[in-house]
């Protein structure tokens, strides 16, 4: 059935399904430069909705938007040894401009800790200048070798938050506060269940003291890191000499954080909820929540379209995102298929017989149709959209629970990571972690904050667990 509609079934080739649905649902296309994509209006509308939600939450927590340069002197990156080592393989570097070789090469922004640190060293003098709570919406460039639309692209859009604090305690509180905002976005807006946790030393952000993350499980059993929040300690403060005088007139280094979420979150939405018929979009982030498809012959055209327009206005008045598909060149069947492919949560079918009965047919993207009084639709749909969100979340959570296993032997571990999350003890040794990755392609995703304390022995080498609880392992994007 899926193939008739032009999509490879997920069970046959999930990766191919993903690439096809992005193009056929008109989310994005490939750019002329390898590893770049063109985000089409429908895909960009999802990103705009994500932006609006996050921007509101950032401002509610006292953050302000700012913008820093795209070009960063290479000497800035070299100031923090771990940072430059972590990003060097992915850097795009400008060596010539205006027809001449530059005195100093410029990195095209891979992330902005260094340039913001430089500016803070100019702006921060006293405890009165703290905290600094900044966010930047922009693009970054990381020259990825293996690219995939939304998940890994050479250039991508994201937000990166950067904050500076007087104490470690304040900075660590900020790290968790921002991670919880990402978790809220995932659960309450994208209907994606996520695990909040701590990255291992091997997997942390280059230059961080530690990294926290939200991890989601996709329908092919692979994990996706959907957002990260880092405690940078005094690392960048020392590199860029960001000092302040505290209330006791002592000169100290600030404690900084950074946190980011990119358009790979769109990839998470696609792979958590999509099916063989196409996208299934969570209503709170969907560009179109309800599509109205009028069904008519020539003699009833005017009457049906007039009623459809009236319904559209009534739904817009409820604050819903509505589209009326009044294209004459396509059949209703073609339109049904197209809007299913594009993942619109609800479709209203309205024909002359429906009008006579003062009713309309409401079809859900999750399956099923019902006939409702036309006048009742504007009142009924907001509640139905909420129920749609809850059902999406329930299904995703059930999938995750069905594909999560506690394992205590390496054989069981190897089996578990073929289909989802493996919860296992680990010794904390980077070399052991690397061997697990080489032997199984699975990586540590996080040490979950919510997991019960539990003692045990490393699933691979048998040494005592370093974390006092099980670690989440999975193959990952």
Swiss-Prot record:
L-proline binds at residues 111, 113, 142, 230. Keywords: Aminoacyl-tRNA synthetase, ATP-binding, Cytoplasm, Ligase, Metal-binding, Nucleotide-binding, Protein biosynthesis, Zinc. It is an enzyme of class 6 (ligase). One of its GO terms (cellular component) is cytoplasm. GO terms for molecular function: ATP binding; metal ion binding; proline-tRNA ligase activity. The keyword Glycosyltransferase does not apply. It comes from the Bacteria. The keyword Metal-binding applies. Its main location: cytoplasm. Zn(2+) binds at residues 427, 432, 458, 461. GO terms for biological process: prolyl-tRNA aminoacylation. Residues 340-369 are annotated as: Interaction with tRNA. ATP binds at residues 142, 153, 225, 228, 262, 264. It catalyses: tRNA(Pro) + L-proline + ATP = L-prolyl-tRNA(Pro) + AMP + diphosphate. Its EC number is 6.1.1.15. It is found in: Cytoplasm. Belongs to the class-II aminoacyl-tRNA synthetase family. ProS type 3 subfamily. Catalyzes the attachment of proline to tRNA(Pro) in a two-step reaction: proline is first activated by ATP to form Pro-AMP and then transferred to the acceptor end of tRNA(Pro). Can inadvertently accommodate and process cysteine. Homodimer. Only one tRNA molecule binds per dimer. Consists of three domains: the N-terminal catalytic domain, the anticodon-binding domain and the C-terminal extension. The C-terminal extension binds a zinc ion, which probably plays a non-essential structural role in stabilizing the fold of C-terminal domain. This is Proline--tRNA ligase. It comes from Thermus thermophilus (strain ATCC 27634 / DSM 579 / HB8). The gene is proS.
């Amino acid at each position: 059935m899926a193939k008739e509609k032009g999509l490879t079934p997920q069970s046959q080739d999930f990766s191919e399904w993903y690439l096809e649905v992005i193009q056929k649902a008109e989310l994005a296309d490939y750019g002329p430069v390898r590893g770049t994509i063109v985000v089409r209006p429908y895909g960009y509308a999802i990103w705009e909705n994500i932006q609006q939600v996050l921007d509101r939450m950032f401002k509610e927590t006292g953050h302000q938007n700012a913008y820093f340069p795209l070009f960063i002197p290479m000497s800035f990156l070299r100031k923090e040894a771990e940072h430059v080592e972590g990003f060097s393989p992915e850097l795009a570097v400008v060596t010539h401009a205006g027809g001449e070789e530059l005195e100093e090469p410029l990195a095209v922004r891979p992330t902005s800790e260094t340039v913001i640190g430089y500016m803070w060293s100019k702006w921060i003098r006293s405890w009165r200048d703290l905290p600094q709570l900044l966010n930047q919406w922009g693009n970054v460039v990381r020259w990825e070798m293996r690219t995939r639309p939304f998940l890994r692209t050479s250039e991508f859009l994201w937000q990166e938050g950067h904050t500076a604090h007087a104490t470690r305690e304040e900075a660590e509180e900020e790290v968790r506060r921002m991670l919880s905002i990402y978790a809220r976005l995932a659960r309450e807006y994208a209907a994606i269940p996520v695990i909040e946790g701590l990255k291992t030393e091997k997997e942390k952000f280059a230059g961080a003291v530690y990294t926290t993350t939200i991890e989601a499980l996709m329908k092919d059993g692979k994990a996706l890191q959907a957002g990260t929040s880092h405690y940078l300690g005094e690392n960048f403060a020392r590199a860029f000499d960001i000092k302040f005088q505290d209330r006791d007139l002592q000169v100290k280094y600030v404690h900084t954080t950074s946190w980011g979420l990119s358009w790979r979150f769109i990839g998470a939405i696609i792979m958590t909820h999509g099916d063989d018929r196409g996208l299934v979009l969570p209503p709170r982030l969907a560009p179109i929540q309800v599509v109205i498809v009028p069904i008519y012959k020539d003699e009833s055209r005017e009457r049906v379209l007039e009623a459809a327009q009236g319904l559209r206005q009534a739904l817009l008045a409820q604050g819903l995102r509505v589209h009326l598909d009044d294209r004459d060149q396509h059949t209703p069947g073609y339109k049904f298929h197209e809007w299913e492919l594009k993942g619109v949560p609800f479709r209203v079918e309205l024909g002359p017989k429906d009008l006579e009965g003062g009713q309309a047919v409401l079809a859900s993207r999750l399956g099923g149709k019902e006939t409702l009084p036309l006048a009742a639709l504007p009142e009924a749909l907001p509640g139905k959209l909420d129920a749609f969100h809850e059902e999406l979340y329930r299904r995703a959570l059930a999938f995750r629970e069905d594909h999560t296993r506690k394992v205590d032997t390496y054989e069981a571990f190897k089996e578990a990571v073929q289909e989802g999350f493996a919860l296992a003890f680990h010794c904390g040794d980077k070399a052991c972690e690397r061997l697990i990755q080489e032997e199984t392609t699975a990586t540590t995703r996080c040490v979950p904050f919510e997991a019960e304390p539990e003692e045990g022995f490393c699933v691979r080498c048998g040494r005592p667990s370093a974390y006092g609880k099980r670690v989440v392992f999975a193959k990952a994007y």
